[in-house]
């Protein structure tokens, strides 16, 4: 990747992904970049684990998150056309004020931070147990290798290498399936437990609630919607959503195969399947994880540099400051590996916590709104999401009887409340504006 990644020194290439002639990214490279940036190493692992537990429904439930990609692309095109905003941070600053924009930036930076350790941890798990020397060392080496080529060209380097990684990822996933699935002739698409709610339907409903706000809190995805023209952007986002969802469903078959072949069910499904398949499948699985994790990491580093330099306006030498911010994120993002794996769960931003972004981006506006219309729903969802993770029993009822019955109930309550408080603040703002107009 070091040889393929271009070296750039201009703001247009380093932060906006333009080529040497000044052209914006076209459909093929933009589509490939979106797909591999959103097929995280952790996503592939989750897809396989859900396939092991819930069969085909598990894969479909996780694939629903990828519906957020084309919807996100379409909504950002509307933002660009109606307001002329050059980023989501700029849009929020115009409509809800600078305080709201800074809070949104904090959410983005936490997300980018989480992307580092959540992907390096998956790669490290193929070299040793969490917390072991081999686990930590492999995670750090992997981070360093990705950082090395991303420093050369920023977003342009990320886009170019993503195209190569996309082709290799497709090949690796197909070879993995061709190797694993035939070893499980009795593979079942059904869930492990019988019953409607045990089929994973509750998880699918949670994904439907979360898919749009989840997409909008990921700068790796949203940044790319500002790089090219409207037609190119929507075509790329539509194709990426279809391809990404398809890959997730396909990889859930690895989990179904892992359930059939048996082995240590306490480990992640890809590791379980790899252990049963021998050295060959282990090497293939490691390739899949390194390709998906690497593409996400380089996108994370380039989005970090853009957030620091263009959104926060830090530094006087943009490209140099961008490179320094990448190095800082690489170091900080791997601290959980050095401090112990328990901190990973404590720092994860759950999908419930960002449900407050749903009304912000589904109810677009050209006019200024009260800051409370941003802080109330977003703050409420952060609080409820944290409570649901720490004390899920505080909500006295559940929806259904499946494993995710409590999670579904928390999400239904949270999404309803954030829309209510958002509507109240918007209504109050219009009411106050009308009074001032009459005077």
Q: Can you annotate each of these PLM segments?
A:
Residues 85-93, 153-162, 217-246, 263-271, ...:
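Hydrophobic, small-residue-rich membrane helices and short re-entrant helix-turn-helix hairpins
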Residues 1-3, 373-439:
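A generic transmembrane alpha-helix motif of multi-pass inner-membrane proteins
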Residues 60-150, 210, 289-299, 317-319:
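Helix-loop-helix module between adjacent transmembrane segments
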Residues 2-8, 113-116, 120, 124, ...:
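Hydrophobic alpha-helical segments and their helix-loop junctions in multi-pass secondary transporters
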Residues 17-84, 209, 221, 226-263, ...:
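Membrane-interface helix-loop-helix modules in multi-pass membrane proteins
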Residues 24-35, 67-68, 97-111, 142, ...:
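Select transmembrane alpha-helical segments in multipass membrane proteins
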Residues 1-44, 150-156, 166, 172, ...:
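Membrane-interface "cap" regions at the ends of multi-pass membrane proteins
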Residues 98-102, 306-345, 350-351:
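Loop-to-transmembrane helix boundary motifs in multi-pass membrane proteins
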């Amino acid at each position: 990747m070091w040889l393929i990644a271009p070296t750039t020194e201009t703001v247009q290439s380093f932060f906006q992904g333009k080529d040497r002639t000044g052209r914006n990214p076209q459909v093929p490279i933009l589509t490939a970049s979106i797909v591999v940036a959103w097929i995280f190493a952790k996503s592939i692992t989750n897809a396989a684990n859900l396939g092991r537990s819930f069969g085909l429904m598990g894969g479909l439930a996780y694939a629903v998150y990828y519906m957020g990609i084309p919807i996100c692309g379409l909504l950002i095109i509307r933002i660009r056309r109606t307001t002329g905003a050059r980023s989501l941070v700029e849009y929020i600053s115009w409509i809800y004020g600078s305080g709201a924009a800074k809070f949104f930036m904090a959410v983005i930076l936490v997300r980018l931070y989480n992307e580092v350790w959540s992907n390096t941890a998956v790669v490290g798990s193929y070299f040793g147990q969490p917390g072991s020397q081999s686990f930590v060392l492999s995670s750090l080496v992997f981070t360093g290798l990705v950082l090395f080529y991303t420093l050369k060209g920023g977003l342009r380097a990320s886009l170019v290498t993503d195209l190569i990684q996309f082709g290799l990822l497709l090949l690796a996933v197909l070879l993995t399936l061709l190797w694993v699935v035939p070893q499980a002739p009795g593979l079942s698409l059904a869930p492990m437990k019988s019953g409607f709610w045990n089929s994973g339907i509750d998880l699918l409903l949670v994904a439907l609630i979360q898919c749009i706000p989840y997409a909008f809190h990921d700068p790796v995805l949203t940044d790319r919607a500002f790089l090219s023209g409207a037609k190119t952007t929507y075509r790329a986002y539509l194709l990426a959503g279809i391809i990404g969802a398809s890959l997730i469903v396909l990889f859930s078959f690895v989990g179904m195969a892992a359930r059939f072949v048996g082995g240590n069910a306490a480990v992640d499904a890809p590791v379980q399947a790899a252990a049963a398949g021998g050295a060959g499948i282990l090497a293939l699985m490691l390739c899949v994880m390194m390709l998906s994790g690497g593409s996400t990491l380089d996108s994370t580093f380039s989005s970090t540099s853009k957030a620091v330099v263009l959104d926060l306006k830090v530094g006087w030498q943009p490209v140099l400051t961008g490179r320094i911010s990448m190095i800082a994120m690489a170091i900080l993002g791997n601290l959980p590996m050095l401090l112990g794996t328990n901190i990973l769960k404590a720092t994860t931003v759950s999908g419930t916590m960002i449900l407050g972004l749903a009304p912000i981006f589904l109810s677009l506006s050209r006019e200024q709104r009260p800051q409370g219309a941003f802080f109330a729903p977003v703050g409420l969802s952060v609080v409820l999401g944290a409570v649901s993770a720490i004390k899920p029993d505080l909500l006295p009822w559940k929806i259904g009887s499946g494993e995710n019955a409590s999670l579904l109930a928390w999400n239904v309550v949270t999404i309803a409340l954030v829309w209510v408080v958002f509507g109240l603040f918007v209504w109050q703002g219009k009411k106050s504006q009308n009074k001032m107009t009459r005077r």
